[in-house]
Amino acid sequence: MSLFQVYARALQYLAVHKFRVGAIVIANIVLAAITIAEPILFGRIIDAISSQKDVAPMLLLWAGFGVFNTIAFVLVSREADRLAHGRRASLLTEAFGRIVSMPLSWHSQRGTSNALHTLLRACETLFGLWLEFMRQHLATAVALMLLIPTAFAMDVRLSLILVVLGAAYVMISKVVMSRTKEGQAAVEGHYHTVFSHVSDSISNVSVVHSYNRIEAETRELKKFTQRLLSAQYPVLDWWALASGLNRIASTISMMAILVIGTVLVQRGELGVGEVIAFIGFANLLIGRLDQMKAFATQIFEARAKLEDFFQLEDSVQDREEPADAGELKGVVGEVEFRDISFDFANSAQGVRNVSFKAKAGQTIAIVGPTGAGKTTLVNLLQRVHEPKHGQILIDGVDIATVTRKSLRRSIATVFQDAGLMNRSIGENIRLGREDASLDEVMAAAEAAAASDFIEDRLNGYDTVVGERGNRLSGGERQRVAIARAILKNAPILVLDEATSALDVETEARVKDAIDALRKDRTTFIIAHRLSTVREADLVIFMDQGRVVEMGGFHELSQSNGRFAALLRASGILTDEDVRKSLTAA
């Protein structure tokens, strides 16, 4: 993207406040006009003093300009600050909502820390651009547009010096930006690396401590920061050189105005006041050009940060719901997969040609080795991923035609890692249903065999569980997650390795809760512990993304196939059981 495209898109985010921005634009035009008028008025005051005329009216006018300029600048700055701060907060909220809605595959490929870093840096960068646009950029642009024609109207010869000065600034900035474009992009890449390393180390601090990695991780961070500085220093050197060249051009221009102005005054071709006005113009131009250079530098540095954010925004908008998406209502729970295929990007993993039908209220167990596609299958059901081919129907309705929100309202999931947030136990359970009363939360906890350990804690349901629930044991976390699913009371239930983190005693306590939860619900169970799938109405054995075997638990256990072999390997089924079943057959 060009600098202009980056800047234009950054300003588009202000369109939601177009009337407030419009008022600030008008105020900036007025302020710019006053800025141009001041040197002219000052020159006329000098001429009046030289000719011993009455200067009181002009001094009062000059003072009035000064007072008005000060008050107007304060008001513009105040409104600009409020608008920029408010828009930054709303953009952060909007972008957060869109990013969180992206599929897990997107987050896995991009990296959580990368998306977070991109969002935060972009919001701060946009905030700076908005603020400077409303405070300085616009006023500077208007002042420059008014200054040049006003100067030419007064004297063409001195005006040409101002034009040459402006051209010198533009050429110097253009050369420096072309020389440092790749370097600045590299700097931004190094910032992402540093942020990712810090985020990764802190989020895995227990591993860092356990394996004595503190010094090693610190050394690694130092190495990344050194690479960042190695990329940053050449960019800074170029901009330092540009500042020096601009300063030389400014000094030469000022000297030229003084020398030529003196000669013209001595010849009687120009008044002293006009030379003073041009000196004021030159100072004004130098100041405004310095602001424009700073503005160009700001946009140049912002481009690397914002291009990544704009790409992120575009990828998120591509996933927005179609306008004609319907609502999934009154779900009974009949689920059908019709020839579903899906592949992860840059990977051979996925699912291929999966077809089956589950009646309402049935329990479907999905088993198979790691990487077989079990979790992918239930993620497709929840539209975490979109299938490349085929249809998934709930009660005969293609889920691709309904909103994700209404679809997921009909599905409750208990994850393998519980998925608790750093909030209170009560708030984590209420994720199932935000408007639930405390009595309903407590009833759900009781049904999940979680009320005992919750009430034993000092703050009870107000106990904050820590990041990812690290202040609770694995079994406690899982029971809170089950309580959350109970509270949601959805017609379709997904248990993704829901009991894998539990010991035998706790699993026995939770089994009753899960059995109660499964009642009258279509339930999908993903499990490595095959003992948990005995009561399944339908068992789907998957391998390498394909359905290898499908049938009832007893049917498959007696078929001497892959599922039966897995049962024998886990000790649930013995060779004697197989012989008996074959004899009975």
From Swiss-Prot:
Residues 335-569 form the ABC transporter domain. It holds the Pfam family ABC_tran. It is a multi-pass membrane protein. The keyword Protein biosynthesis does not apply. InterPro entries: AAA+_ATPase (IPR003593), ABC1_TM_dom (IPR011527), ABC1_TM_sf (IPR036640), ABC_transporter-like_ATP-bd (IPR003439), ABC_transporter-like_CS (IPR017871), NdvA (IPR005896), P-loop_NTPase (IPR027417), Type_1_exporter (IPR039421). The chain crosses the membrane at residues 22-42, 55-75, 136-156, 158-178, 245-265, 269-289. The keyword Ribosomal protein does not apply. It is found in: Cell inner membrane. Its EC number is 7.5.2.3. Involved in beta-(1-->2)glucan export which is required for nodulation of legume roots. May be involved in other classes of oligosaccharides export. Transmembrane domains (TMD) form a pore in the inner membrane and the ATP-binding domain (NBD) is responsible for energy generation. Homodimer. PANTHER family: ATP-BINDING CASSETTE SUB-FAMILY B MEMBER 10, MITOCHONDRIAL, ATP-DEPENDENT PERMEASE MDL1, MITOCHONDRIAL. In NdvA the ATP-binding domain (NBD) and the transmembrane domain (TMD) are fused. This is Beta-(1-->2)glucan export ATP-binding/permease protein NdvA. The gene is ndvA.
